[in-house]
Amino acid sequence: MATIIRQSYIDKIERFLGKETIIVLVGQRRVGKSCMMKMIRDRKISDSSNNIIYIDKEKREFDPIQTYQDLNEYIGQHFHSDKHNYILIDEIQDIKEFERSIRSYRTEPNTDIIITGSNARMLSNELSTIIGGRYKEIYIQSLSYNEFLQFHHLVDNDEALALYIQYGGLPGLAKIGLEEDDAREYQIDIYHTVLLKDVIMRNQIRNIPFLENLVRFLADNTGKLISANSIAKYMKSQGESITSTAIINYISFLCEAYILHKVNRYDIHGKRIFETNDKFYFEDNGIRNAIAGGTREGDIEKVIENIIYQHLIRLGYQVYVGQLQAGEIDFVCTKPGGERIYVQASYIIYDKATREREFGNLHAIKDNYPKYVISMTPLLTKNDDDGITHIHLRKFLTEGL
C-alpha cells in the first residue's frame, strides 16, 4: 500500500525546522503522529549532511531507554557534531524526566528535535516548566473527510460520507478495511490501548469499571450539556456512588489522552465563559460509535455534531458552545485577530419547526458576524437565508466555509 502524505501537517512541521524550536506532535494514539515523524525522517535521511537519531518507545529495541540518563547516553552515542542532527523521539512520555535531555540538546548547534506524545498534561507541564516557550505544539487529528476519501480510494458521494460518519478517520482502517466487524474490533482495540496506557496506568486509576461506564455515558450523550453533578446523579441511579470531584478528575484524564474534548459554554450577550455545564466530543467519531454500540436510531445528530466540531478545529478555530438568554448556539468559533462565526449543526431540516429552531437562534444574535447552518438536507449545496448561510455537510467537509 502506497504511503499517503498528509501534506498540511508536513508543511507545518517543516516551517519550524531550523528555528531552535522543539516540535511536539500531540494527539490521541493511532491518529498518525508516528507516520508524520517517519515521513520527516525519510525526507531528511537522503541528504548525507544530515544525521538521524530515531527512537520509537513502542518498539522493544528501545526498552532499555527508561530515564533521561539512558536517553542522554543513546543520543550521545549517535550524535554527529559535524552534521545536522535530527533527534526524533516517538511517545516520549514513557521516558522518565525526558525534559532534562531535551533541554540539554536543544542548545546544540545544527540540531532539530521532534517528539510525539499522547498525554497533554505531562507534555505541556514538563516542557513549559523546563524550556519555556521554545517549543511548538502541533495537534494531529484523525483523518478529515478529504483524507478519508484518499486513504480509502473513494469518490466523494453520499455513500462515502455515510462510511465516514459510521467509521471515522483512524488511518489504520485503510489496512483493516471498512467491513463492520473488522473495523469495530480495530477501533475497540485502539480505545482499550488508549484507556490502559494513557489513562489508567498514567493516572493509577483503580475504579476501572466506573471509568468505562463514564466513557459510555459520554458517548451516549455526545454534544449534550453535562455537569459532574448530573453525571453523579445518573450513576447513583444506576447503583454506583462516586463524587463529583472524582468525575471531574476522570474526565480531565480522558481529555489529556485526547480521546475526549471538552467545550466550554460562552455567554454570547455577556461575553464571558461559564465554568459549569460543558459539552464533550470524541477525537474520532468511529471510536465514539464503537463505544456506543454503533450509530443507533437517534444517534445521527450527535455524530454529525461531533464531525462538525472536529472539522472546525481542523480549520483553526477555537470553539465554544454559545449560550443565549432563551436558546443555544451549537458552536461559537473564533480565531486570533477578532474573526468569529456562529454554526448550528443539524441532520435534516425537514419541517418548519426544525427550520425555526436552527435558524431562529441564529437570528436572535444581533451582530454582523457570519452565521451558518450545516446539515445533510437533500439536494442542498449552499444557499443564503436572510444572512444565514445553509451549507451541506459534504460541502463543508470538502471545501470549508
List each model region and its residues.
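Conserved lysine of the Walker
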Residues: 33
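Short glycine-rich substrate-engagement loop in P-loop NTPases that contacts/grips substrate
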Residues: 53-83
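Domain-level recognition of nuclease-like catalytic cores that cleave nucleotide substrates
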Residues: 378-401
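Hydrophobic positions on the alpha1 helix immediately C-terminal to the Walker A/P-loop
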Residues: 36, 40
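Accessory nucleic acid-recognition modules appended to NTPase machines
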Residues: 179-339
